[in-house]
A protein has these predicted regions:
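A short, Lys/Arg-rich alpha-helix, primarily the initiator
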Residues: 1-28
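Residues within the alpha-helical elements of helix-turn-helix
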Residues: 25, 36-37, 66
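Short coil turns linking two alpha-helices in DNA-binding domains
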Residues: 29, 40-41, 56, 70
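Short alpha-helical "recognition helix" segments of helix-turn-helix
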Residues: 33-34, 63
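Recognition helix of helix-turn-helix/homeodomain-like DNA-binding domains
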Residues: 39-54, 77
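Short, basic-rich loop-to-helix N-cap that marks the start of a DNA-contacting helix
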Residues: 51-62, 81
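DNA major-groove recognition helix of helix-turn-helix/homeodomain DNA-binding modules
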Residues: 58-73
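Short amphipathic recognition helices of helix-turn-helix/homeodomain-type DNA-binding modules
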Residues: 73-81
């Protein structure tokens, strides 16, 4: 049987857009997210929203709880077979 390799990755730009949309839906600001996640500065949140980086697994889980969104709703992936 031939093995198929799956090349999967998280799309940081689309993930950031999903986070921003969920924040807007809940009327939460970057400051609200920063405080709720116990971050020392809002820099990480801005980087997520711009698609420069993606949240750690702990932070994306916390965001899903805070934003009442599933991980699937927040994380945007791309798969190349």
């Amino acid at each position: 049987m031939e093995e198929t390799m799956i090349n999967a990755a998280i799309d940081p730009v689309k993930t950031g857009e999903n986070i921003r949309e969920a924040m807007n839906h809940k009327n939460l600001t970057v400051r609200d997210i920063t405080l709720a996640l116990g971050l020392s500065t809002p820099n990480a949140v801005y980087k997520w929203l711009r698609g420069d980086t993606i949240p750690s697994i702990d932070n994306i889980y916390a965001l899903s709880l805070l934003l009442d969104s599933s991980l699937d709703e927040l994380i945007a992936g791309r798969v190349v077979l």
